[in-house]
From Swiss-Prot:
Catalytic activities: tRNA(His) + L-histidine + ATP = L-histidyl-tRNA(His) + AMP + diphosphate + H(+)
The organism's place on the tree of life at top rank: Bacteria
Keywords tagged on the record: Aminoacyl-tRNA synthetase, ATP-binding, Cytoplasm, Ligase, Nucleotide-binding, Protein biosynthesis
GO molecular function, one term: histidine-tRNA ligase activity
Subunit structure of this chain's protein: Homodimer.
Name assigned to this protein: Histidine--tRNA ligase
Family from the record: Belongs to the class-II aminoacyl-tRNA synthetase family.
SUPFAM superfamilies found in the cross-reference section: Class II aaRS ABD-related, Class II aaRS and biotin synthetases
UniProt-annotated location(s): Cytoplasm
HAMAP family, per database record: His_tRNA_synth
CDD domains, per the entry: HisRS-like_core (cd00773), HisRS_anticodon (cd00859)
Gene symbol of the encoding locus: hisS
Amino acid sequence: MAKNDKINFSTPSGFPEFLPSEKRLELYLLDTIRRVYESYGFTPIETPAVERLEVLQAKGNQGDNIIYGIDPILPPNRQAEKDKSGETGSEARALKFDQTVPLAAYIARHLNELTFPFARYQMDVVFRGERAKDGRFRQFRQCDIDVVGREKLSLLYDAQMPAIITEIFEAVHIGDFLIRINNRKVLTGFFQSLDISETQIKSCISIIDNLEKIGEAKVKLELEKEGINPEQTQKIIDFIKIDGSVDDVLDKLKHLSQTLPESEQFNLGVSELETVITGVRNLGVPDKRFCIDLAIARGLNYYTGTVYETTLIGHEALGSICSGGRYEELVGTFIGEKMPGVGISIGLTRLISRLLKAGILNTLPPTPAQVVVVNMQDNLMPTYLKVSQQLRQAGLNVITNFEKRQLGKQFQAADKQGIQFCVIIGADEAAAQKSSLKDLKSGEQVEVALADLPEEVKRRLT
């Protein structure tokens, strides 16, 4: 590099970085989500950021996601050696685009070491070749849970997912939300009753999944492009627009099952949906938190049963803030055994970005510190260090100012970081084993004995 060449140190488009106040908010949300996941017995795992490409692409797992491939970048001398020898390198590898496909590979690798049903959570970054724009990222954190069984998996695990979603979003106080539930078998069975082919059904599900993005008129147009005739198209539109209370929709589906040509798939889907709804209610989730929405399809090919999407009421334009569903064949792809699973995912990076922009969430102070012990005189540093440790041992987060500056500047720096208290100890205070405690929020300053300082700070902390 030439001496005057400048390095472009800006972040690559679509790859976020966080200021301390933003990162602390993310950590708070991660901790809240983790506590709820663990309260239901989910256990943490970690999978590699890089997987073999054939794993990520198996059986159409990739969907519409653009995968980032990984190629080693060799030093110039090594590259020349490789070119000369004609080496082709190792198998193709890529960055994971979600947590679910790597979970399937993980279970295949550790099948005999795990206990089933296997309930895991993972809160990790994934990578997709999204078109970088506001609220969409190429690197983002997902907070996933999945339960995977061997041969069978109770539908009560499907019912448990809305209960978990409800606990998380009520705990973080983001306002009213609605969990929209459907079953892919209901959709598939309805399409079969219209004599739509299996290949067309997959396309129809993907098109319906975009209803809110592209609107009804474009959905009709896209369906007709797939060879769906106008009569079939209108029946599909009428079907996915069925609404009402949960019980109303279930009643309409049961009535429809009596008028449709015999469809085992449709009837099974309605039965599963009713079982899940009953379980959701038994878990104490209030009816205002969920509904049946027949337009919810989830575009990924591996979903086969229950599907979920969660939206914020009044902020529907933000899109889904938590989604997921049941899959029957994803894990079995790797081991040739039936291993049904169900899971949900919270796209946390995207969620934080959208909620901050909408003013629904606020960042936290940039430091976790609650107290600053200011530096009045360098020769009193042994006292400052001792007092700081006493405060920490009482469970407080403390910064000790090692550099002596004007007192006003030390107050300003503490206030800028959102720190509530400053402890002031000069020569006279040190000799008398006292301190001045300044509350930067209220401006109040009181004299406190050093022995009483930890409890006084905790008493006043807001």
